UniProtKB/Swiss-Prot annotation:
Compartments, record wording: Cytoplasm
InterPro entries: RraB, RraB-like_sf, RraB_dom
The name this protein goes by in its record: Regulator of ribonuclease activity B
Organism: Proteus mirabilis (strain HI4320)
Quaternary structure, from the entry: Interacts with the C-terminal region of Rne.
The gene coding this protein: rraB
Amino acid sequence: MADSKELAEQREETRLIIEELLEDGSDPDALYAIEHHISCENFETLEKAAVEVFKLGYEVTEPEEIEIESGEILVCFDAVSESGLNAELIDAQVEQLMNLAEKMGVYYDGWGTYFEDPDAEYDDEDGENEDDESESDKSSRLH
């Protein structure tokens, strides 16, 4: 079971992220892609965790390597769900994924999402923003 102190820290972080998004003018009624970050030193271990995360109903992104401040290389993926900015729902996801991470021997590294412009125009068929926004523009808004 996830450490209660770490869970409390994550709950506080969740509320801070939501507060900052709303203060910045993000759409309070939008559906957000909630990206939970999972990492590990070992690809095989990470792959097993990704399978379990997928079984829980999350979309799992392709694994990629990242270098952390110490110079160590980790492999990571995101477990993605779509929801409103509901702190209790996100808390439940965080706890679920922290427990799984502990069980599988991987790290839960928090979550993030993107600013949702309340004035953006969306294509009715696929919900994609009609504005031509590059991936680099989007990544700069990750909270």
